[in-house]
A protein has these predicted regions:
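Conserved phosphate-coupling serine/threonine residues in phosphotransfer and NTP-handling enzymes
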Residues: 12, 107-109
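N-terminal helical cap/lid subdomain that shapes the substrate entry/recognition surface
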Residues: 2-91
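Conserved Lys-Pro-Asp/Glu-containing loop-to-beta segment of HAD-superfamily phosphomonoesterases
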Residues: 4, 141-169
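Short, acidic loop-to-helix structural element flanking the phosphoryl-transfer center
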Residues: 77-105, 112-115, 140-143
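A short, structured active-site edge motif that brings together acidic residues
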Residues: 40, 124-139
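Glycine-rich phosphate-binding loop signature in dinucleotide/nucleotide-binding domains
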Residues: 98-101, 152-158, 211
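Acidic, Mg2+-coordinating phosphoryl-transfer loop and its flanking beta/alpha structural elements
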Residues: 161-199
Length: 211
C-alpha cells in the first residue's frame, strides 16, 4: 500500500511571503494608506479575499474588489515567478514520488498562480492532484476540501498532512490525519496549543530522513 502526502503550498513548499507581502503593501499604499502597517505584518496563508478583507477592514469594504483585481495583476504578471522553493523541497517531492507515494496539494492559494509556479519549477510530475480553494466554490475551507475530495482513505497505508499554519493543523485534525508542522514557514507565532502535531520539522530534508 502506498502513502498519501498532503502538502500546503505557501510557507511549506515555497517561500512566497516576500513577493506576496510586497504586493499587499504596494496595493494598500494606493488604496488605503492608513492600513499599510497592518499589511506589512499580515499572515500569509488565508485566501486572497480573506486577506483583502483583513487589510482593508470594515471601513474600506467598498475597495475589496479593486484590491483583489490589482493584486492579481501585480502578483501573477510581475512577482510570482520570483518565488523560491524551500531548500530540499524538490528532493523531498522526488523522494516520495520514487517511493510510489501519492502526493497532493491543498492550498488557499488561487489555482492560476499555483499551477503556473508548479509548472515553472518543473514539479508537475510530482503531484497526483492539486486542490486550490478558489476552484471549489462549494467548500467553505480547506477542511471541507479534504473531507470531500479525498476518497477511499482506507486504500493508503498512511496519510500525512504537512503544513505551516494553525489552519493547516486544524484541517488535519478535523479529518483525523496526522499533522507534520513545518516550523520554517509562516505560523511560528500562532497559538498551537489546541493543535495535535505528530512531528515538527525544521527542514524538508527531515521528510527524506524520517519517512
Amino acid at each position: 500500500m502506498s502513502r498519501l502526502w498532503i502538502f500546503d503550498f505557501d510557507g511549506t513548499l515555497v517561500d512566497s511571503e516576500p513577493g506576496i507581502k510586497k504586493c499587499y503593501v504596494k496595493i494598500t499604499e494606493k488604496l488605503a494608506p492608513s492600513r499599510v502597517g497592518f499589511a506589512e505584518n499580515i499572515l500569509i496563508g488565508p485566501t486572497l479575499l480573506e486577506t483583502a478583507n483583513l487589510i482593508l477592514s470594515n471601513q474600506n469594504e467598498e475597495l475589496i474588489s479593486e484590491f483583489v483585481e490589482l493584486f492579481i495583476q501585480e502578483y501573477d504578471q510581475k512577482i510570482l515567478l520570483e518565488t523560491k522553493p524551500y531548500k530540499y523541497a524538490t528532493e523531498a517531492l522526488g523522494y516520495l514520488t520514487n517511493k510510489n507515494d501519492e502526493v497532493i496539494i491543498a492550498t488557499n492559494k488561487r489555482g492560476a498562480p499555483t499551477r503556473k509556479l508548479i509548472n515553472f519549477l518543473g514539479w508537475n510530475p510530482f503531484f497526483n492532484w492539486i486542490g486550490c480553494m478558489d476552484e471549489f466554490k462549494n467548500y467553505k475551507n480547506k477542511s471541507d476540501l479534504i473531507k470531500n475530495e479525498i476518497k477511499n482513505k482506507n486504500k493508503y497505508e498512511k496519510i500525512y498532512f504537512v503544513g505551516d499554519t494553525v489552519n493547516d493543523g486544524k484541517t488535519a485534525n478535523e479529518n483525523n490525519i496526522p499533522f507534520i508542522f513545518a516550523k520554517f514557514g509562516y505560523g511560528k507565532k500562532q497559538d498551537w496549543s489546541k493543535i495535535s502535531i505528530i512531528k515538527t520539522i525544521s527542514s524538508l530534508k527531515e521528510i527524506i530522513d524520517n519517512y
